[in-house]
Regions:
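Bacterial N-terminal signal peptides that target proteins for export
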Residues: 1-7
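Extracellular "leader-to-stem" segments immediately downstream of a signal peptide or signal-anchor
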Residues: 7-8, 13-85, 91-97, 357-398
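Active-site-proximal beta-strand/loop segments in catalytic clefts of secreted hydrolases
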Residues: 70, 87-89, 114, 124, ...
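Extracellular beta-strand-rich solenoid/capping regions of secreted or surface-exposed proteins
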Residues: 74-81, 91-112, 119-145, 151-182
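Extracellular beta-strand/beta-solenoid scaffold signature
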Residues: 96-100, 123-135, 157-178, 194-203, ...
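Right-handed parallel beta-helix
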Residues: 107-108, 112-113, 137-153, 181-194, ...
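Extracellular beta-rich repeat passengers
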Residues: 282-398
Length: 398
């Protein structure tokens, strides 16, 4: 395989993709306001177009509608409110609540927490899902920011045995945010922990996504939960405490950059991954990851209540069809810091890196080549890997 030729083709495709039109966007729904027009401070009236990544999302121009309960949130959703401001903690109930945005009516949407960092969606998933749209159409221009997403362990333990593909699978599909067939999305200053699938995912030919200044981790209570229920994930039984996965970009080989139509351009910058992660992000897209902190400082080494190994199996995984450029990231005590895991032997992938720092890491780690061409076409400023330890305190909701 001529990897230099492959990379030239991949980067050329990237630049062509960036030069394409952003796509049409629909006007916000004029339905009557639900709840109250917000007197709470939104983070910004309108966000800048430079996200430090592939996204140029600005979200909604509408006035924000404040929601402070599950009833408020669902009423705002049913009224097609495009700018929702979350105030305080909202609980989705013991059986979990998924709010699904499934049509292009949801183009130009902002969901954000009020300033102060106290906005929480507990047992609630925000799912932007354009899977049923006509071919070539995605939901466009979505901003999610300044919110903490997390599950309630006792509620997940109390669910009936979860089996993939059955009616008892709400827990298996539970994430904080799921982006499916979404183009131009920005997830910023959020926190994700203790959800029973990946904490977040970007799949099904989504494109031009930036995830920034966010935290992804599991608590020690998750790691040591008892009872530790056994669930069936896609034909494989595994205990819940052992399902500690950060993020998925690209659902499978067919939903990857190289094999899925040169989509899934995703930037990850200024995020903290860990502690207590089993593994991932698993990356099958065209990924630029810079100034992230991969934190395995807790270094779990024991067994879960069901007898599974608590040890981290990787920190960042490159999957089939993925192109990953890792720049100025800090890996702290991570095990198998960067791992190549292909769906089939011989699948193409590419890994390039620059100025990463590996501090007290263990196990084998892939090593990347240096780019010979400019990897991205957007403006960004990468710091030094050592500066991330100071910057990490600015990550998460504010």
């Amino acid at each position: 395989m001529n990897w230099r030729l492959l990379m030239t083709i991949l980067i050329a495709n990237l630049l062509c993709a960036r030069g394409s039109a952003h796509g049409a966007s629909s006007a916000p729904d004029p339905s009557a306001a639900t709840g109250s027009q917000s007197s709470e401070a939104a983070i910004t009236a309108r966000l800048p177009t430079n996200t430090g990544g592939f996204a140029t999302a600005t979200g909604s121009d509408d006035s924000a509608v404040t929601v402070a309960s599950l009833a408020d949130l669902l009423a705002a959703f049913n009224a097609r409110q495009h700018h929702i401001l979350v105030k305080g903690e909202i609980y989705g109930g013991p059986r979990l609540t998924t709010v699904t945005f499934a049509t292009t009516d949801w183009n130009n949407t902002t969901i954000e927490g009020a300033s102060g960092g106290s906005a929480v969606l507990k047992n609630i998933q925000l799912k932007f899902d354009g899977e049923m749209l006509p071919a070539g159409k995605n939901i466009q221009n979505v901003v999610i920011r300044n919110i903490t997403f997390h599950g309630v362990i006792r509620d997940l333990q109390a669910l009936p045995a979860q089996v993939y593909g059955t009616s008892s699978n709400a827990g298996i599909n539970y994430e904080g945010v799921s982006l499916r067939r979404v183009t131009n999305a920005w997830v910023d200053h959020c926190a994700f922990y203790d959800t029973s699938d990946d904490l977040m995912s970007v799949t099904l030919s989504s494109d031009r996504v930036t995830v920034s200044y966010s935290r992804f981790y599991f608590t020690s209570e998750w790691l040591t939960m008892h009872p530790d229920p056994m669930w069936n994930w896609a034909g494989k039984n595994q205990d819940l405490a052992n399902e500690r996965l950060a993020m998925l970009v690209g659902a499978n080989r067919q939903d990857s950059y190289a094999y899925g139509g040169n989509r899934l351009h995703v930037t990850l910058h200024h995020n903290q991954f860990g502690p207590n992660l089993k593994g991932r992000p698993l990356l099958r897209g065209w990924i630029h990851a810079y100034d992230n902190y991969f934190d395995n400082g807790a270094t779990p080494t024991g067994l879960t209540a069901a007898g599974s190994d608590e040890t981290q199996y990787n920190a960042l995984q490159i999957g089939s069809g993925g192109v990953v450029y890792s720049e100025n990231n800090y890996f702290f005590r991570t095990n198998q810091s960067i791992q190549v895991g292909l769906d089939s032997p011989g699948d193409v992938y590419a890994f390039h890196e620059n100025a990463n720092r590996y501090d007290q890491t263990t196990g084998r780690s892939a090593r990347g080549e240096v780019f010979s061409l400019a990897p991205v076409g957007y403006a960004y400023r990468a710091g030094t890997a050592s500066s991330i330890l100071k910057a990490v305190q600015t990550f998460g909701p504010r």
